[in-house]
């Protein structure tokens, strides 16, 4: 359910004996388990870098979304939004620079470049589709290194639309159930092709395309967090 926001002023917080940064914007609202922390605790959310439910997350415990020119905007930014709602630390990394332009002309100022990402800091490496974005990711030596190193250390990989072909070309889908945008199946070397829109097999999640970007993002919350965080977010955004 969406909240109507009344932000208490400093005097109200003080009278309640609470620190302003850690008190809810909605009087009487129980924030335990709340998925919309940015709304309920806007000051603390901002203080913690805009991504943490229980305080700042460690930088070595994060999701990195790789962006290259020509990326599909909804496939990339829906997971950023949803994972941050779940309290996870998410960073965007640009291939070839910090400002990356999507396939529909939307530019994103990334948090870092691909050369600044350390595989040991990454729990989940996410590859959006879109053309020529997916081809540009595939051609990046830094992205290749990150994919191999994150996978080798047991981290998670996720790819949507055309991007699963990047994993397929590296032999990482062999023996796994996987899906992709129609027409790229031949690139998923050794995979068991699934008709499902979103598939998780082991440490790899794949999805068909932009139309299932929200389902893809919610599945990533499910595999990263225990409990019902994914369901709570789905309910809060009116997912049918």
Language model regions located:
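Extended, subdomain-level signal for the structured scaffold at the beginning of enzyme domains
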Residues: 54-157, 165-169, 175, 187-195, ...
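Anionic-ligand binding patches
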Residues: 178
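Cytochrome P450 catalytic-domain "roof"
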Residues: 200
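Cysteine-centered metal-binding/redox modules
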Residues: 2-56
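Short, thiol/selenol-centered motifs that function as redox-active sites or metal-ligating centers
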Residues: 34, 160-161
